[in-house]
Amino acid sequence: MSAPHTSSPRTAALIPAAGSGTRLGLGPKAFVEVAGRSLLARSVAALAPFVDEVVVALPAGMDLPAGVPARAIVGGETRQGSVRRLLEATEAGTVLIHDAARPFVPPPVILALLDAIAATGAATVALPVADTLVRAEGQSWGQLVPREGLWAVQTPQGFRRELLLQAHARAEAEQYAATDDAGLLARLGVQVRLVPGDARLFKVTTPGDLALAEALTGHVDGGWLTVEGEKR
C-alpha cells in the first residue's frame, strides 16, 4: 500500500532507536538480531509499505543496517528528545511513532490506526488488560486493582504532526517527561483514540522477550501467519 512519492510526505513513520538497551544487556537494543535480522530492520519493514517515509533516530556514530529503507538522524539524550528531533526532521502531516523493539506489527493494526488518526488526529494501539492486577506492598500482596477499563498501551501511535509538536514544546517548557507520546497529548486535553492492538506487539526488553521473539519468527518470516485467517 505504498503511497505515491511527493515532495512533501503525507505520512511518516518515526522510530526513536537511540536507547542503550541496558536491561537486555546486548548493546543498543534496536540492533539486536532476531533470527539474523535486527529489531530495527523488522520494524522498518513492517511500517514502510504504509507510509511515505521512515525516519530513525540512532545513537551518535551509528549507521542504519544495510538495506533498511529509511533515513537516519542522531537521537536525543532521552526517548522524548529523540521524538522531538524526529518531528523536526520530517514535513509529513501525519506521523506514526513506533518503538523499534516491537518488531511484529500486523498490517490490519496499522490500517486501523491510520483510519483512527484520519478521524480524530490522535490515536494509539492498546490492549485491554487481561491479567489480575495487584498493588504490591514491598514483596507482598497489597491491594487488588480492578482491571475494568484498563488498557496496556503499545505502539505504533499516530498523530497529526502539528498537534504532537505543540505537545512536545509544552512538555519541554514545563520540564515534563512522559513515557510515551499519547500521554503528552492527553495532558493537553486532546482525546486519544484507543485502537485494539495485538499480543504480538510486545516490546523486547528482557532475555525472555528475546527468546519469545526468536520463537515467533518461525511463523512470521516470509509472511504474516500466526493466527487463523491472516494472510501469508
From Swiss-Prot:
EC code(s) of this entry: 2.7.7.60
Residue(s) at site: Transition state stabilizer: 23, 29
GO biological process, one term: isopentenyl diphosphate biosynthetic process, methylerythritol 4-phosphate pathway
NCBIfam families noted in UniProt: ispD
Family from the record: Belongs to the IspD/TarI cytidylyltransferase family. IspD subfamily.
Site (Positions MEP for the nucleophilic attack): 147, 203
Protein name, as recorded: 2-C-methyl-D-erythritol 4-phosphate cytidylyltransferase
Function recorded in the entry: Catalyzes the formation of 4-diphosphocytidyl-2-C-methyl-D-erythritol from CTP and 2-C-methyl-D-erythritol 4-phosphate (MEP).
Organism field: Deinococcus radiodurans (strain ATCC 13939 / DSM 20539 / JCM 16871 / CCUG 27074 / LMG 4051 / NBRC 15346 / NCIMB 9279 / VKM B-1422 / R1)
Superkingdom classification of source: Bacteria
Pathway: Isoprenoid biosynthesis; isopentenyl diphosphate biosynthesis via DXP pathway; isopentenyl diphosphate from 1-deoxy-D-xylulose 5-phosphate: step 2/6
Catalytic activity: 2-C-methyl-D-erythritol 4-phosphate + CTP + H(+) = 4-CDP-2-C-methyl-D-erythritol + diphosphate
